[in-house]
Amino acid sequence: MPRIPTVELSRYLLTGHIASPGCLRARAALPGKNTRVALGGAPLPSRQLQPRQHARYLTTETSFANPSATTSSPAAAAPFRKQLKEQAKALKKSGHKKKKSSDNQTVPGWELTVGIEIHAQLNTAHKLFSPATTSFNDPPNTHVAPFDLALPGSQPLFQPATLIPAVRAALALNCSIQPVSRFDRKHYFHWDQPSGYQITQFYEPFAKDGFITLYARDGIAAEDGEEIKVGIKQVQMEQDTAKTTAQPGDVQWLDFNRVGVPLIEIITLPEIHHPATAAALVRKVQMVLASVDACVSGLEEGGLRADVNVSVRRTDDPSGKLGTRTEIKNLSSFKAVEDAIIAERDRQIELLEEGGEVKGETRGWSLGSTETRRLRGKEGEVDYRYMPDPDLGPVVIGEDLVARLRETMGVLPDQEADQLMERYNLSAKDALSLMLLDGGARIQYFYNVLDSLEERLVADGQAVPEGAEHATLAANWCLHELGKLTDSASSSSCSDPDVLEGLAMTPLGESPLVPSSSLAAILHHLYSRTITAKVAKDLLWAVYRGEIPEGGTTSYIDTHGLWFKELPEEEYAKLADEVIQGEEKILGEFLRWKQGKMKAYPQGKLMFLVGKMMRGGPEGRVEASGAERVLRRRIEEVYLPELEKGE
């Protein structure tokens, strides 16, 4: 057997470069172009520190330096949500209309069956089998240990601390923790896995037999009723692979910072029968993992990846056997999960109705696609040759650790959603949006704002008010008004150079662009009726643009004379009389309501007139609730009696 030249072996191990495809010993070139693989792009970059965002792991410090020190990378891709918006615009322009999701959950005569595999990066300080620290934003190849590169003589060293978020995640998913689990080798060769195998837990995972309950508020299909329970077969620990970035000229850049980062793979039972329910499950799992601080980031940020197995069968099939399944790999958004399942279901049904046969294969899905694409067939599947890892002993998890983690679990998403709806009077949609936004950080931001707001009310000599009015105000602003900032920022029609994109929210629920204390100061004045809602919104924009420093809200209001000087009652009444003139048709609706001819109070018409009062009154002196109160009293006590007399 020929000996591999030392130079060739070194170039592969240290830089990931292979001069020719195929076996290094045979050096047999394959037809077609060669693909060059560069470790982070040519030579190993220096360890010069670069700016990065705050990593999810809270003990990891952020490094700062001149960004020009690194090798330039391709221009950043447009934000994921912006890509979806652009594609929606293109579809609308072309006149192509998609079915509503709610109309596309079933096909008469056919049953869909879906199983899901979710891979989630764990929130840990170190990699799974090396002392190298985890990194998600640092320069490429600066967090790499010898074992991560499979250098000769290096051995795996299991890091026990990685068990903590893994067990916490499994408990949150109602799994049974196994006292003993073992690691196996999954063999395959690819440039993103230097050792030629991945260490996983194929035979003896650390957690089994769990379940997750989905409710109507989670977005499940209407056909599934108010709730559905989906079983979880197992949860296993495994290594992540290197991050591959395609470059022009058939070049792949490899970042080995990600090699060996601990993952958990969550495998559900095939108990899902509607596409919307599958997407809801992935969304719910992400929320559960974030709530117990087990996962680094969400689906759209790359910290969570989903594969789905799809099969169909006729509902009148006497055998009752499931159809042949296909697997769709690496779905990167909740919408992609639902759309890909619908497309693959329809493809399989069409094939079977034409007399064809569904083949077991792996398929792919691209953003904005209308159909799945074939990646490889069953005959092309790799024989992974699973075998126990001889270098790693069994993992023993004590009942004392399990009990301790169960006691310190904290509030899970269902409990938190119930609290937001019952205590703060939020709708189910708003509660879930708060919990999902910014990778789960928006809900913490809301609590920070609420705490700061209540401190200010107490400092004013007020007791923390009973009921949920102030909390509902804070929640609505944290969700809707902050949402308007980011919507405007991401809009392609927004040309304001001062408008930034996103809120740069940290895992601790803070935003350097809109600090929670600044929003609380605005809401304190709004709740106390010392500024109007319009002024409050203008102040929020000023904070976002950096015009108001943290702690400077009150002085800014003073300097610009923005304090609310409310009109006296008689001025409100005069303004109400002015807007009512000529609105006999609207007054007629109020009269029909009073006479019992209409069930619902015409609130929309009332607010239309309030809007006229706001626009017609002195700038900054008309307060909406005061205008509504006076207007309603004038209509019911003055104008309706006059109309009744005239009948």
From Swiss-Prot:
Compartments where found: Mitochondrion
Which Pfam families does this chain map to? GatB_N
What does it do?
Allows the formation of correctly charged Gln-tRNA(Gln) through the transamidation of misacylated Glu-tRNA(Gln) in the mitochondria. The reaction takes place in the presence of glutamine and ATP through an activated gamma-phospho-Glu-tRNA(Gln).
Q: Which cystines does this chain contain? A: none
Q: What segments bear the compositional bias annotation Basic residues? A: 90-100
What else is on record for this protein? This protein may be expected to contain an N-terminal transit peptide but none has been predicted.
What name appears for this protein in its UniProt entry? Glutamyl-tRNA(Gln) amidotransferase subunit B, mitochondrial
Q: Which domain of life is it from?
A: Eukaryota
Family the entry assigns: Belongs to the GatB/GatE family. GatB subfamily.
Signal peptide annotation = none
